[in-house]
Amino acid sequence: MIETVHVNVPGRSYDVIIGPGLLTQGGPRIAPFLSRPRVVIVTEENVAALHLAALKTALADSGISSEALVLPAGEGTKSWPFLEQTVEFLLTQKVERGDIVIAFGGGVIGDLVGFAAATVRRGVRFVQIPTSLLAQVDSSVGGKTGINSPIGKNLIGAFHQPTLVLADTALLGTLTPRDFLSGYGEVVKYGLLGDANFFETLEEEGAAIAAGDMAARVRAVTRSVQMKADIVERDETEQGDRALLNLGHTFCHALEAATGFGDRLLHGEGVSIGCALAFELSARLGLCSQEEPSRVRTHLKAMGMKTDLADIDGDLPDAAALLALMGQDKKVVDGKLRFILARGIGDAFITSDVPADVVLSVLRDGLALR
């Protein structure tokens, strides 16, 4: 049940290996890339408690020594203080360009460690071992790394491709239902942006995926990674098509900023709401029928996911303030917001031609339901 997706970017091609049991194969999978038998691992406390011993054992069985830095869990770790701590740890460990740093965790750890690897000695290699569904299908693939700023999400970072990605789908069984569904928001995004047949498959298999059907999970992760790899190969540094991967994210990042990048709203939950709002905005602009956002919401709700501003606990800014937060998004070009909208499920496109009053109306109507 092991699948491999090859990501072919100039000078930095690598494999994403997907399936159950890969953690115990960590030693032989990583050993061919090492110039000396040692690695440095950066992880977070929850993953460390569950899986760090197994990874270190797998490495030791292949004669590979390892040292680990364990950071706090949560989005707050994706910040300057923990970047500094990570960089200092790598330097203290005398990491060289021929060494491998392992990012062992979810999207926060992958983004943080990838950025640290990009900066230490002007770039050392790193391996992603993503432990969350969100990281397996999205953040571990494609080379985007970085941290958040108080001004906005992911505003500080670099493109730095991994050397290898090991996506052990068995690890998904240790996620809380909320964390798993947060990642599922990114899976659905792929169907919505470019593969109507995949979205239809998710409508049929979503319950099985959530229930732990391993074959269904491997299929969903593999198709998601294939779609991301195809887009990254065409546009590694987000000059064009790669922006399609941000479907739902213009709304999402504003909502994350409004909720303090914390547990009130997980990233994948924001993506889920953002995708629903992007399809609602598309329908109001006459780009697709109202049946499309209704179908999107129906599937997300059936999976127990957030779809509306009313699903976010606590206070939110008004529509104008949310629009201002959207203006801090890194996709702004010449002061204009770029939206990813859709002509239908599986047919997304990029545009800056979106009247602010229509965006405000979507936000106001969503807030009115709270």
Question: What does each model-identified segment do?
Answer:
Residues 60, 92-95, 161-164, 170-177, ...:
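Generic secondary-structure signature for well-ordered alpha-helical cores
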Residues 3, 185-187, 287-370:
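C-terminal charged capping/lid subdomain of soluble metabolic enzymes
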Residues 115-208:
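A glycine/threonine-rich phosphate-anchoring loop and its flanking beta-alpha core
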Residues 204-320:
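Active-site segments that bind and position negatively charged phosphate/pyrophosphate groups
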Residues 108-115, 136-137, 253-254:
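Short glycine/serine/threonine-rich phosphate/pyrophosphate-binding segments
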Residues 1-100:
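ATP/NTP phosphate-donor binding region
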Residues 8, 33-34, 94-96, 119-121, ...:
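Solvent-exposed alpha-helices and their adjacent loops that cap or buttress functional pockets
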